[in-house]
Amino acid sequence: MFEYLMPQLIMPSYANTLLEQTCKAAVARQIEYGRQRVVPWGISESSYNATDMHQVYQYRAFGVPGLGFKRGLGDDLVIAPYASALALTVMPREACRNLQTLADKGFLGAYGFYEAIDYTPTRVPPGKHHAIVRSFMAHHQGMSLLGFAHVLLGQPMQRRFMSDPLVRATELLLQERVPKTGATLQPHAAEVSAAAHPPAAD
C-alpha cells in the first residue's frame, strides 16, 4: 500500500482529483479485503514470519488482489500496521479504528506497532491463529510517525514541502481532475481511404 500512500506524507491532496480518488479507492479495497479475510486490514511490503540462518526475518512485497499486478497475492496474508498509519492521510477515521483494533489485539511493542502480523497458515505455529513479526523497521516507523503527525499536527510535512517556491510552481499537477470522457481521435480522410483499399500483396 505504500506505493499509493507514501507520497501523501509530503504532497498535499486535493478533493475530487485523480490522486485523491485513487488513494481512497486503494484504502477502500484494503478495508474490504480485511473484512473478506476476517483480519485487520493493511497489507504492504514488510517482513513476515520466516527467518534465515541468522534468525533475521525475511522481507518482501505483499499486496491485495485487485490492487497489485503480482500473481498469487491471495496466497499470503501479512498485515503491516504501518500501512494503516499511512492511511491516516486519506481516511483518518477508518485508519484510527484499525490501529485501535491492532493495539487491542496486542500488536504494540516497546517502540510502537510491531512490523507485521502473519496470518498465512503455512507460517503460523501449530494451534495459533497468527504469528507476530516482533521487529521494528526504521523506515516503517518513520512513515508511521509522519502519518501520526499528519493527523495530530495539521499536515506539517505537506506545509513544509509546499513552502518551496519550485514545488509550488508545479502544484497544478497535483490538482489533475478525473477525466469525464475519454479522448477520441478522428482519422484523416486519407487514412480512412487507405484502410478501405489496402494495397494488393505481390
Regions inferred by a protein language model and the residue ranges of each:
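Ser/Thr/Asn(+Pro)-rich, low-complexity disordered segments
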Residues: 1-202
